[in-house]
Design a protein with these regions (language model features):
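Conserved glycosyltransferase catalytic-site signature
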Residues: 82-89, 105
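Short active-site oxyanion
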Residues: 24-28, 54-57, 98
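Acidic catalytic patch
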Residues: 33-37, 55-78
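Short, well-structured N-terminal submotif of metal-dependent ribonuclease cores
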Residues: 1-30, 37-50, 74-79, 114-117, ...
Length: 144
């Protein structure tokens, strides 16, 4: 989502959501997994992540999140090449985050994939996790 701030296709909505975080309209939650991925990103993305990390709650990888990741793999929710994406969702699920926000339409922000995660979560005793794109979440161009 942070990288979307610098992508012509996604910047309007990504920056709108970043403004929402800065205005404290929503609580931002990041993770150690996000930080590790950002290390490989362009400098402007790393700089924005550093700024946002000051506003955010940070989630560390826990045994419970790793267990849930293994369950997602066992349920074949996603292909194993998307292990980090499943870990993001496991971390958010275990932490009872309200919404996971992503621009990854290929295998996350897609109804059938969301239903797979919800099904696995319910079967394993976790609540469903809402998954949306920044455009669906930001208050940009809406009355607040």
């Amino acid at each position: 989502m942070i990288g979307g701030c610098f992508d012509p296709e996604f910047r309007t909505w990504s920056n709108g959501l970043i403004d929402d975080f800065r205005a404290r309209r929503f609580n931002l939650v990041l993770s150690d997994v996000t930080a590790a991925e950002i290390r490989r990103a362009p400098a402007q993305v790393r700089e924005l992540h550093t700024e946002l990390a000051e506003l955010a709650e940070n989630l560390s990888v826990t045994e419970e999140a790793l267990y849930l990741l293994e369950q997602y793999e066992a349920h074949r929710v996603l292909d194993s090449r998307f292990r980090n994406d499943m870990l993001h969702i496991a971390l958010a699920t275990v932490a009872a985050v309200d919404v996971l926000v992503s621009w990854t339409f290929q295998h996350i922000v897609r109804l059938d994939m969301i239903q797979r995660f919800i099904g696995a979560n319910l079967e394993l005793g976790y609540r469903p996790l809402a998954i949306y794109s920044p455009r669906e979440v930001t208050t940009y161009e809406r009355e607040v």
